[in-house]
């Protein structure tokens, strides 16, 4: 009787552990694909400024861009907090008109969870921001760049656009800077 009860307990414990492992594997290793961008670029296409994301420059001030690179947020909450604290400090010190993040924003298997947190932090500044992807943003194919792009497109202040599908990568876009409604810089 004791052996049977111990055997049942062991089966329940092992089944529970196996179930937890399966859920974790599904959450971490099932790729989130996202919607593929379908716009196609052609050299014959007419360029239209009004199709670009636009940031208005204050006439009385220089236009300031804060450039952030290689934040590489990952599974260490202490490091992530230090990174966010540093970003907050830089934003407060520089009061930028635009924040650009130039790749390696999130890293590793937890990127699907960290992306939302990162977007929330960036949106909290209420400043337009323009991210691009680096090699670490999709090094582990659990969150494709298309899926990450879908999340960025939901952001209130993010200027990200997926761009044409026939150009390499996801996130080929330009930002138009205007003053009094007139373009002063368009890359």
What kind of feature is each model-predicted range?
Residues 2-21:
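N-terminal Sec-pathway targeting helices
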Residues 37-38, 43-50, 116-187:
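Extended active-site neighborhood of metal-dependent phosphoesterases/phosphodiesterases
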């Amino acid at each position: 009787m004791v052996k049977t009860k111990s055997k049942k307990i062991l089966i329940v414990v092992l089944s529970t552990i196996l179930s937890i492992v399966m859920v974790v594997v599904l959450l971490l290793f099932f790729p989130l694909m996202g919607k593929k961008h379908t716009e196609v670029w052609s050299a014959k296409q007419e360029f239209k400024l009004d199709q670009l994301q636009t940031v208005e420059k204050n006439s009385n001030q220089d236009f300031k861009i804060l450039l952030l690179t290689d934040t590489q947020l990952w599974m260490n909450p202490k490091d992530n907090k230090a990174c966010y604290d540093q970003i907050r400090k830089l934003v407060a010190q520089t009061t930028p008109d635009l924040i650009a993040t130039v790749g390696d924003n999130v890293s590793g298997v937890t990127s699907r969870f960290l992306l939302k947190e990162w977007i929330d932090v960036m949106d909290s500044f209420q400043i337009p921001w323009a991210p691009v992807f680096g090699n670490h943003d999709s090094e582990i194919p659990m969150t494709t760049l298309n899926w990450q792009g879908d999340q960025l497109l939901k952001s209130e202040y993010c200027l990200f656009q997926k761009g044409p599908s026939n150009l390499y990568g996801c996130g080929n876009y330009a930002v138009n800077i205007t003053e009094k409604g007139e373009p002063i810089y368009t890359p």
